[in-house]
Design a protein with these regions (language model features):
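Short membrane-interface helical motifs at transmembrane helix boundaries
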Residues: 93-114
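Interfacial transmembrane-helix starts/ends
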Residues: 3-6, 41, 62, 73-89, ...
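Signature of the first transmembrane helix
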Residues: 4-62, 163
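Alpha-helical transmembrane segments of multi-pass membrane transporters/permeases
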Residues: 7-12, 127, 141-167
Length: 199
């Protein structure tokens, strides 16, 4: 069983790698090298960095605890509820402060040569950040429960959302649409993750 699970997880990981490669190819095809791809990369730079740090901290601190208490229903439920409450409040804080975060990011990085709508694009990128943090908590829960395949599946949803947008909106594709694809994928991954945990 362990060998079969390891093979399954390896295949899912490779699949995620292929999805990432497909996204890079589609972005290059749709945007090439220029202002739009610079806007996409710059708008995501800080929000993705923040989400990655917070998710890594959650994974490092939560996984050992969850692994230890997963067979104790009361403690497990109490801890999971506390973790979900924490990331929900953090996501709400980011959404409330989104205007200030976008302004601060524009002060840190020179956006003078990218899209004129960069302010709005950065705000959307911070929404992506909030969703990624919530997803990161769910991934930590699955890793702690040693249900790694679900963690990997959740990660793939963001890539799938972007790919679908790039494929079906190729004539009208824009940075905002790509970010919308990320948000859509993250949203459905969160819904699926919460459903699996609560079933």
């Amino acid at each position: 069983i362990m060998i079969r699970s390891s093979i399954y997880i390896t295949l899912l990981t490779l699949g995620n790698g292929l999805l990432g490669f497909a996204i890079q190819m589609l972005l290059a095809k749709n945007f090439g090298v220029g202002v739009e791809i610079d806007t996409y990369l710059f708008s995501l730079s800080i929000p993705i960095f923040v989400a990655a740090i917070i998710s890594s901290i959650m994974n490092y601190t939560s996984v050992p605890v969850i692994a230890k208490i997963k067979n104790d229903p009361d403690r497990f439920e109490k801890y999971i509820n506390s973790l979900i409450l924490f990331v929900t409040l953090l996501a709400i804080f980011i959404l409330v402060m989104i205007g200030y975060l976008a302004e601060a990011q524009q002060l840190l990085i020179d956006y003078s040569y990218v899209d004129n709508n960069i302010g709005e694009i950065i705000k959307i990128a911070w929404i992506v950040c909030a969703l990624q943090i919530f997803q990161g908590a769910l991934i930590s829960i699955f890793n702690g429960m040693q249900r790694h395949k679900y963690a990997i599946i959740l990660v793939s949803f963001q890539s799938i959302g972007v790919i679908l947008i790039l494929i079906f909106s190729y004539q009208f594709v824009s940075v905002i649409l790509v970010l919308f694809g990320m948000m859509l994928g993250l949203f459905f991954s969160i819904v699926l993750g919460v459903y699996i945990i609560n079933r």
